[in-house]
Design a protein with these regions (language model features):
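Core SAM-dependent methyltransferase catalytic element
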Residues: 185-207
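Conserved beta-strand signature within the Rossmann-like core of class I S-adenosyl-L-methionine
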Residues: 154-161
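A short glycine-rich, Lys/Arg-flanked "PGG" loop and its adjoining helix->strand segment in the class I
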Residues: 141-153
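Conserved class I S-adenosyl-L-methionine
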Residues: 162-178
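N-terminal auxiliary segments of SAM/dcSAM-dependent transferases
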Residues: 1-22, 33
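Conserved SAM/SAH cofactor-binding pocket of Class I
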Residues: 43-129
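Short beta->alpha hinge that forms the Motif I/post-I loop of the SAM-binding pocket
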Residues: 88-90, 139, 162
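Conserved SAM-binding loop and adjacent beta-strand
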Residues: 31-48
Length: 207
């Protein structure tokens, strides 16, 4: 998936689109070489619209943020977010994200470069991701499975994944590490909530 590769060789052609969600209008700058350049993609919309917003609070992280849709929308919508870190490996997407942060008045968001959790050195109350399926299974699993190492003791992981792209098998694997809840299914997209199974995690560390 293009947002998880650094496509600096593609000629830049910045465009804008507007979208409405949670009774608010947002404007996003996009470009060649980023995921979903012309509109808010359906999977991300499904994730946002099915999040239990009362649980999105404290310190938040998104892995694979692209041009910043999720953190910008959530910090404009949810009052109890203290800070929102958002990372990606695509420098062009991060440049757009900074533009979008200013345009949509989202001062709580901090965008920075990181290959998955490479540059992450703290733990979060909530981690959110629409993982880049086309970047490969290894990247997806690194994002969702390694999240446990970056969650606070009572932290939560929220993801969205398409049924045709392995949602069922991923859910089974997630259950080995997390207590999982299938929040909703919508047109093939599964919105999943994960809470750490601390006893299992601790036993794995001992082994």
């Amino acid at each position: 998936m293009s947002q998880y590769f650094d496509n600096v060789d593609l000629k830049s052609n910045i465009e804008k689109y507007k979208t409405r969600i949670f009774d608010k209008e947002f404007c996003f700058n996009t470009d060649n070489g980023v995921f979903s350049k012309s509109k808010l993609d359906f999977g991300t919309r499904c994730l946002l619209e099915n999040l239990p917003l009362e649980e999105i609070k404290g310190e938040i992280l998104e892995v694979g943020c692209g041009y910043g849709v999720i953190p910008i929308i959530l910090t404009r919508t949810v009052d109890k977010i203290d800070s929102f870190d958002a990372v990606d490996v695509n420098k062009r997407a991060l440049h757009l994200a900074e533009m979008n942060k200013k345009e949509n008045f989202s001062p709580k968001v901090n965008f920075f470069l990181s290959n998955c959790y490479q540059n992450i050195n703290k733990k979060y109350d909530v981690i959110i991701s629409n993982p880049p399926i086309r970047a490969g299974k290894n990247i997806v699993y690194e994002i969702v499975m390694n999240a446990r190492n970056y969650l606070k003791e009572d932290g939560k992981l929220f993801i969205v994944i398409n049924k045709d792209q392995g949602a069922k098998s991923l859910y089974k694997d997630l259950e080995k590490v997390y207590k999982c809840e299938l929040i909703n299914k919508k047109k093939g997209f599964w919105i999943i909530k994960c809470i750490l199974r601390w006893q299992l995690v601790q036993s794995m560390l001992i082994i």
